[in-house]
Curated annotation (Swiss-Prot):
It is an enzyme of class 2 (transferase). ATP binds at residues 95-105. The gene is ispE. InterPro entries: GHMP_kinase_C_dom (IPR013750), GHMP_kinase_C_sf (IPR036554), GHMP_kinase_N_dom (IPR006204), IspE (IPR004424), Ribosomal_Su5_D2-typ_SF (IPR020568), Ribsml_uS5_D2-typ_fold_subgr (IPR014721). This is 4-diphosphocytidyl-2-C-methyl-D-erythritol kinase. The active site is at 12, 137.
Length: 282
């Protein structure tokens, strides 16, 4: 088996986000619908025999040992008892604080890559359980299927939904998830709904009004995108998105947006590009 491996870490969108209540431990009960994008970071791994975990790519403002990639590698190392280590390089394309899962996706890709490189043989459930300790969004990336999520986001029901093209606008802000969920004006009493209701269009993102109020850049991006398509915030933001039936229409609207707005066009996918790549390795 090769000691080197390169894998993608795909972005995700929250197609809606309803907050049902707040638990005694401070976490929020929610419902959301995750779908992947064929766009993301790229990670490169090379196994080491001395047990060291080294991330060779610096992320501004994130200490090496606090990076989710390093925490994922060390967590798997400890839980599995593997004596092996790894060198990791990251091609970072996804924004931090964007609501499209950059850090969680990187962590999930790390877990799956090292399960393969270190020949651990862990099953999907065991990897997802370890991923949940790193963050509520990590399991959806380790499982790799579009899903209706409940609880704090960890109860996942796979779904088969349309796979449109998306135009994603990336405002230049770093949104604090903790800040949004602690805002006293955040809606916390949305009624539970079914997936069918979401697909019929009766849903929203409960975080969006709070984010728009706190971050004018996000509000302005929504105003601009709403001129061409129904736009919505993903997660706690700050990325916003609109869906299109084909790439040509998404590209057309992208070309009409101001040059200063960062954005990208990507296809939605119910099976993540990470898992499609992993299937070719088996």
């Amino acid at each position: 088996m090769s000691v080197r491996l390169s894998l993608p870490a795909p972005a995700k969108l929250n197609l809606f986000l309803h907050i049902l209540g707040r638990r005694d431990d401070g976490y929020h009960e929610l419902q959301t619908l995750f779908q992947f994008l064929d766009h993301g970071d790229e990670l490169h791994f090379e196994a080491r025999q001395d047990g060291q975990v080294r991330l060779h790519t610096e992320i501004a403002g994130v200490p090496h040992d606090s990076n989710l990639i390093v925490r994922a590698a060390r967590g798997l190392q400890e839980a599995s008892g593997s004596p092996q280590g790894v060198d990791i390089w990251l091609d970072k394309r996804l924004p931090m604080g964007g609501g499209i899962g950059g850090g969680s996706s990187d962590a999930a890709t790390t877990l799956l890559a090292l399960n393969h490189l270190w020949q651990l043989g862990w099953d999907e459930d065991r990897i997802a359980a370890l991923g949940l300790r790193l963050g509520a969004d990590v399991p959806v990336f380790t499982r790799g299927r579009a899903a209706f999520a409940e609880g704090v986001g960890e109860k996942l029901t796979p779904v088969d939904i349309p796979e449109p093209w998306y135009l994603v606008v990336v405002p230049q802000v770093l949104v604090s998830t903790a800040e949004i969920f602690s805002d006293p004006l955040l809606t916390r009493d949305s009624p539970a709904i079914k997936v069918r209701t979401v697909l019929e269009g009766d849903s929203r993102n409960d975080c969006q009004p709070v984010v728009e109020r706190r971050y004018p850049e996000v509000r302005n991006a929504l105003i601009l995108l709403n001129k061409f398509v129904s736009a919505r915030l993903t997660g706690t933001g700050g990325c916003v998105f609109g869906s299109f039936p084909n790439k040509a229409e998404a590209d057309k609207v992208s070309a009409l947006l101001p040059d200063h707005l960062q954005r990208f066009v990507a296809k939605g996918s119910n099976i993540s590009m990470l898992h499609r790549k992993l299937e070719t390795l088996v």
